[in-house]
Amino acid sequence: NKLLILSFALMQMTLFAQENKKVQKLDTILIKSTRIDLPFKENSRTINVVTSAAIKNSAATNVADLLQQVAGVDIRRRGTAGSQSDLYIRGGGFDQTLLLIDGIKMDDAQTGHHTMNAALPLEVIERIEIIKGPAARVFGQNAFTGAINIVTKKKLSNKVSINLEAGSFGQLNYSATVGKEYENTSIIAHAGSLNSDGYRTNSDYENNNYFLKGIFNKKNQPIEVLATFFDKKIGAENFYTTNPAWNEYEETQNSLLGVSTTFRTEKFKISPRIYWRRGQDIFLLKRDDPSFFRNLHITNKVGVEANVSYTSEMGITGFGIDISRFFISSDNLGNRNRTMANLFLEHRFTLWDNVDVTPGVAVTYFSDFKFNAFPGLDVGVQLTDNF
């Protein structure tokens, strides 16, 4: 009986200790993948967020490997170390899925096959927002089956990190990431290189990446400047053909330069942005004989956009305009250009404190296809505080 009483007393002490554990509240994530910024728990769209903690705890070494772990996202890869990959959401093709970096559209004038060439190194990513399902109403074309927004870090608090890896088949990876905080400025810089001789014939690669982000005038009107450059040289054995006599080879470049800021008042939020994106792709069917078959494509996109949200007693209204000019120079497609304009409008109504309705429309103009409209409606019901 004494043993039974002692065991019961220990069980009571254990239960008492569990009841006194502190509850840790997590920071609210404000979703930026929509025209209207909303806390994650209040958003009615099907959105997954890969947080910085999830990125840190993941075994993934690049964005392609990380996204492959998300249900509903299909990454089809060729080669290793993120050398080449195509992005699919819910069965849509790579031309139907849009990639954004800090809200900047990274669509390519030639093909969505180059979308993932713009993926950033994990060291500078704060989180990744994944919209599953039709998003053309929010982002226009190239987002018919979904969109992925990579949100970069704003500061690294005077940190320096260096990475060096070596392995079989001539593998050598190295990178450096630096964060510097000044009184009125934040700077993040990253440079890295992934190299290998390849585990089989013509599977070598050299992938170089550079990233620079600055936030200036932080105390008054913050201005963000973002610059990236990626250069890949890939032995593309059997990437596009199965003929063992052809040693395919590909070189790609992807660069981005963007400047943005945000103006805020009690009811208005205005976010203008200007950006330039460049892509280059060289493909050789025979690596040792460039004259046999060679494709060269150079694409440029220059754009300006502004997003506005207005909060009133009727709810939140989101309005956006995006005007861009595409250029392509190709020894196969020739020299072409196109002007595109997107106009977005949506309004979020809240009914009975637990029902939200968001109708909206996107109107897209192409200089060679004229106008197209993409209407849509989101409806959400909050059953409990957490569901």
What are these regions (language model features)?
Residues 28-56, 86:
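N-terminal periplasmic "start-of-domain" segments of outer-membrane beta-barrel proteins
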Residues 55, 67, 128-129, 148-150:
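Non-catalytic regulatory/gating segments with a bias toward low-complexity or hydrophobic composition
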Residues 86, 104-132, 150-153:
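Short acidic/polar hinge/loop motifs at secondary-structure boundaries
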Residues 147, 152-180, 190-192, 196-203:
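Short strand-turn segments of transmembrane beta-barrel domains in outer membranes
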Residues 158, 184-188, 220-225, 233, ...:
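Repeated loop/turn-to-beta-strand initiation elements of outer-membrane beta-barrel proteins
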Residues 196-207, 211, 220-301:
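Flexible loop and strand-edge segments within Gram-negative outer membrane beta-barrel domains
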Residues 227, 261, 314, 332-387:
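Structural signature of Gram-negative outer-membrane beta-barrels, strongest in the C-terminal barrel
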